């Protein structure tokens, strides 16, 4: 779900920069891979990766990729509507709503994604692999699974007040 309007100011955060090498006949070719998360702190977030000979160019490519890969995050006040578990590769992420004022209880890559999405109160736990790219992908996958109460009610064919 790509958003075309660039009128909204997006904040970007570099999650990881890796030095990668390719072994060729003449020796090693060095490049940099960057993982960047962008968001408007208002329910929209995306991530991207970029690779280049220089770090700034890799970051620029990653930001462009992230802007093309934005998702909408449903929120209830300052937190998420319900608990969600997701995994990508060996990384597993558990995201739980928290009471207002609790803050973001999340580590590293998960923190970057949820803060830039605009979630102010959340508890999370990363299990399994701690590879930043897989943690970010698992977190975004979890945020994609979130549904508002109205959506759940319409899927079940009941009113929102009947959900308990």
Curated annotation (Swiss-Prot):
Residues annotated as domain S5 DRBM: 10-73
GO biological process: translation
Record bears the keyword Isomerase: no
Pfam families per UniProt: Ribosomal_S5 (PF00333), Ribosomal_S5_C (PF03719)
Gene Ontology, cellular component aspect: small ribosomal subunit
Record's keyword terms, sorted: Ribonucleoprotein, Ribosomal protein, RNA-binding, rRNA-binding
A molecular-function term among this protein's GO annotations: rRNA binding
Family: Belongs to the universal ribosomal protein uS5 family.
PANTHER family assigned to the protein according to its UniProt record, in alphabetical order: MITOCHONDRIAL RIBOSOMAL PROTEIN S5
Domain comment in the entry: The N-terminal domain interacts with the head of the 30S subunit; the C-terminal domain interacts with the body and contacts protein S4. The interaction surface between S4 and S5 is involved in control of translational fidelity.
The protein's assembly and partners: Part of the 30S ribosomal subunit. Contacts proteins S4 and S8.
Function: With S4 and S12 plays an important role in translational accuracy.
Name recorded for this polypeptide: Small ribosomal subunit protein uS5
Species: Streptococcus mutans serotype c (strain ATCC 700610 / UA159)
Gene name as annotated: rpsE
